[in-house]
Amino acid sequence: MAHKKAGGSSRNGRDSESKRLGVKRFGGESVLAGSIIVRQRGTKFHAGVNVGCGKDHTLFATATGTIKFEVKGPNNRKFVSIVAE
């Protein structure tokens, strides 16, 4: 009698939910205080003037104004600032 042994189940087939990271408001846009500017893992962008940093490294506006992205310092770090209106 010919028999075929049952195949094992795959150990793949899982994936995590996407975290929707990235820049939420771009340079030149007007924002209100408290608006989220960047969601990130680690400090890809650093907080500049009128910008706060949450415990998960989310950058948010602490004042109403216009967003400005700039690269500065010896390590060419990217900073996000708010120019108050």
From Swiss-Prot:
InterPro entries reported in the protein's UniProt record: Ribosomal_bL27 (IPR001684), Ribosomal_bL27_CS (IPR018261)
PROSITE patterns: RIBOSOMAL_L27
GO MF assignments: structural constituent of ribosome
Region (Disordered): 1-22
GO BP annotations listed: translation
Keywords: Ribonucleoprotein, Ribosomal protein
Tagged with keyword Ribonucleoprotein: yes
Highest taxon listed in the record's lineage: Bacteria
GO cellular component: cytosolic large ribosomal subunit
Family designation: Belongs to the bacterial ribosomal protein bL27 family.
HAMAP family tied to this protein: Ribosomal_bL27
Full protein name: Large ribosomal subunit protein bL27
Organism field: Tolumonas auensis (strain DSM 9187 / NBRC 110442 / TA 4)
